[in-house]
């Protein structure tokens, strides 16, 4: 009987831990509806990828940068954050890092910029002048 209780408790706590780090995906069409709200939009692609086209108002924090983890974790924990990358790999990893560090309101755009462009949404380009 005691083994059953202990195993049940371990299972319950394990499930709770897994759920606490679950990644919340949002469709690009749902993001369009909240785009002008108080969410901070973060593009975790490289600077070169960002320059080739990004969603309006996005902040670029390069996932591969040596300072990435310090930069992303410097955001206030109560910040509402929407993440995207090219397809979801880097943004999902970033969401996990944030969740593991106590951030609560994190969304990831399903399909990333690839899905965004595929569905005909506008992108901005970075231009440099000499």
Feature-to-residue mapping (PLM):
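Hydrophobic membrane-targeting signal helices
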Residues: 8-14
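Rhodanese-like catalytic fold shared by cysteine-dependent sulfurtransferases
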Residues: 2-4, 15-39, 47-80, 86-130
